[in-house]
Amino acid sequence: MTNKKALINKLSQPDNLRKILDEKSFVPIPSCFDALSAKLIEQANFDVTFMSGFAASASRIGSPDLGLMTFSEVFDQANNICNAIEIPMIVDGDTGYGNAMNVRRTLKECSKAGCAGILIEDQLAPKRCGHTPGKDVVNREEAFDRIRAASDMRNEGYDILIMARTDANHTHGLGEAISRSQKFYELGADIMFIEAPKNKEEMRTICKEVPGDKIANIV
């Protein structure tokens, strides 16, 4: 067993992810879609993987990322991945599959399965890939309720890092997206995700004005 694997086995997956984020200023996180792709990422010596809803939907049901996969299907995919690898995995929890009560259950089950983190976003259900036209976001209070519910559930003992995503940049502009992300951080989110910055200047502004860890994706 390698020293890296020995360390992982001593820590919970959320704590291991926290340690990685604390120790490194930049962490590449390749996306997986099933147990095999996750194992290949692990064997390539990456520290973390992310179960992409976009990729999982294509792989499992052969359909685009339009909110067609059920929570049960997503959970089954995430559970299989967690059982196959030792590096931490962040699961794409989409909108939480309903209201705040659904978000609580989604987080609880993903935490019990061994996920290190979970993404919860503010799109209107049924959601769609963040890089496609026609998407919309819920109002501020509903968006905040989702992250508040996730934080409350974590504080009840179901440890997991919360990645709070907003798609408001596309529909309401960068200022609204930053404002939502700042509130997500106040509510307990660990990683802030403003979807689809339009250019490098927007990315610089996000890094300057949004607290906590930040993530950007490359499709």
Identify what each model region corresponds to.
Residues 2-219:
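Alpha/beta enzyme core
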